[in-house]
């Protein structure tokens, strides 16, 4: 029964969501946001690394999934997002976790059924799928969406008779 940690990276707010897979069921274990206060980017990256490391220690996930970088109009923002992703990925690889990456379109398609879904639709569907009493905050909902996308990919591979391993883009191990 694998535990999946999903991460929605950001240089100011990084969302995380943890689910456990039991057969075809997904069980909510936890979610939240790592908020950085400093204007100093290296300090923010350390907060992200330390936060993800602590979540890994707390939940002991078997799999790590993260949203892939999108092309932003602002190059500086894209670079900062890439660095935030890097801090989270290093925390996962330090814990010997396999890393899988998914595009925003793949995540929305897995959760809502369309890659053009709005954030509010993702929040609503995450709440429904995981039977939560209220919609999670946006960044946490996105991270839970990443974990759900990974779960659906994992389930699809099993259904096709393949090994229960997901193609990763650079195994980061």
UniProtKB/Swiss-Prot annotation:
Binding site residues for Mg(2+) 2: 67
Enzyme Commission designation: 3.1.21.10
Keywords noted in UniProt: Cytoplasm, DNA damage, DNA recombination, DNA repair, DNA-binding, Endonuclease, Hydrolase, Magnesium, Metal-binding, Nuclease
Cofactor: Mg(2+)
Pfam families for the chain: RuvC (PF02075)
Main location: cytoplasm
Catalytic activity, as annotated: Endonucleolytic cleavage at a junction such as a reciprocal single-stranded crossover between two homologous DNA duplexes (Holliday junction)
Active site: 8, 67, 139
GO cellular component terms, A-Z: cytoplasm; Holliday junction resolvase complex
GO terms of biological process kind: DNA recombination; DNA repair
Domain of life: Bacteria
Residues that bind Mg(2+) 1: 8, 139
Enzyme class: hydrolase
Gene Ontology MF annotations: crossover junction DNA endonuclease activity; DNA binding; magnesium ion binding
Subcellular location: Cytoplasm
Coiled coil: none
Cofactor: record remark: Binds 2 Mg(2+) ion per subunit.
Function, as annotated: The RuvA-RuvB-RuvC complex processes Holliday junction (HJ) DNA during genetic recombination and DNA repair. Endonuclease that resolves HJ intermediates. Cleaves cruciform DNA by making single-stranded nicks across the HJ at symmetrical positions within the homologous arms, yielding a 5'-phosphate and a 3'-hydroxyl group; requires a central core of homology in the junction. The consensus cleavage sequence is 5'-(A/T)TT(C/G)-3'. Cleavage occurs on the 3'-side of the TT dinucleotide at the point of strand exchange.
Family: Belongs to the RuvC family.
SUBUNIT field: Homodimer which binds Holliday junction (HJ) DNA. The HJ becomes 2-fold symmetrical on binding to RuvC with unstacked arms; it has a different conformation from HJ DNA in complex with RuvA. In the full resolvosome a probable DNA-RuvA(4)-RuvB(12)-RuvC(2) complex forms which resolves the HJ.
Protein name (Swiss-Prot/TrEMBL): Crossover junction endodeoxyribonuclease RuvC
Organism: Shewanella loihica (strain ATCC BAA-1088 / PV-4)
């Amino acid at each position: 029964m694998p535990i999946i940690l999903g991460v929605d990276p950001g240089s100011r707010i990084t969302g995380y969501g943890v689910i456990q897979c039991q057969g075809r069921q997904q069980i909510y274990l936890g979610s939240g946001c790592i908020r950085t206060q400093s204007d100093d980017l290296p300090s923010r990256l350390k907060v992200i690394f330390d936060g993800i490391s602590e979540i890994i220690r707390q939940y002991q996930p078997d799999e790590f999934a993260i949203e892939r970088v999108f092309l932003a109009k602002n190059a500086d923002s894209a670079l900062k997002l890439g660095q935030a992703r890097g801090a989270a990925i290093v925390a996962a690889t330090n814990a010997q976790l396999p890393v899988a990456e998914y595009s925003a379109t793949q995540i929305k398609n897995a959760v809502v059924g369309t890659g053009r879904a709005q954030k509010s639709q993702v929040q609503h569907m995450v709440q429904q799928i995981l039977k939560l009493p209220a919609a999670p905050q946006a960044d946490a909902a996105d991270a839970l969406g990443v974990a759900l996308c990974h779960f659906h990919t994992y389930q699809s591979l099993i259904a096709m008779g393949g090994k229960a391993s997901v193609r990763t883009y650079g195994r980061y191990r």
